[in-house]
Amino acid sequence: MGKAPLASASIMKSLLLVAFAAMFTQASAGEAPWTPLFNGKDLTGWTPKIRGCKAGENFQNTFRVVNGVLKVDYSDYPQWDNRFGHLFFTKKYGHYRLRVEYRFVGEQLKGGPSWAFRNSGVMIHSEAPETMEIQQDFPSSLEVQILGGTGQGERTTGNLCTPGTHVEMDGKLDTRHCISSKSKTFHGDQWVNLEVEVRDNRLIRHLINGEEVMSYSKPQLGGDAHAEALAKVAGDKMLAEGYICLQSESHPVEFRKIELQELAP
């Protein structure tokens, strides 16, 4: 008789574990699957827009696929000549998680700006490549800025830059162009995992190797004439969706996984 309570407790514990496992399975089953945006073979589904060129023109094969890796490569460039570029995925998104694996390799192209050393970005809530002006450097968007360490000192990644946009931080409008995250520094050519969680214009979170390094809300167009023109056409300055694109800023960078999970509104 004295052992009966222990047996009952053991049974209850087992039942609770089964219940929690069932709940987790149901939650997982209710989530959308992760979908690759990059097929590992070619640039199907992606459109380049490089400064000085029309949308769709991949100047000097800047964006290329080699051995299953999407490379931003400048080996065919005669010189930099301010050829800032972006590679746009074909579909707009507003509620999603995005996962990207990236690393910096090689040397910066001669003539590239000093601030662009081991510097690139993943743009979200972006305008379309077709609405960019021919000589426009960056699309109006939110740039999840990715930086590589210089070999000494600290240099965070997963930062935020805001070409043609503003956001709210801690409930207040923040008009700074670039805002540092609280990430670690990643030197050398190691692969880094970037994840971005986007809940239309309510909340956006940046995660590096699984750790949240930044969050903000209420992204909106503003800060230059082009962005204000986009807002006028849209009838609203608030950004609830947009395109995803990868950046080229004069330093070679590689992406080997780009996948997205759509979220319920």
Could you describe each region identified by the protein language model?
Residues S8-A9, A22, A32:
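Low-complexity intrinsically disordered segments
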Residues L15-M23:
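Sec-dependent N-terminal signal peptides
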Residues A29-P265:
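Carbohydrate-interacting regions of secretory-pathway proteins
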Residues G2-K3, A9-L15:
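Positively charged n-region of N-terminal signal peptides that target proteins for export
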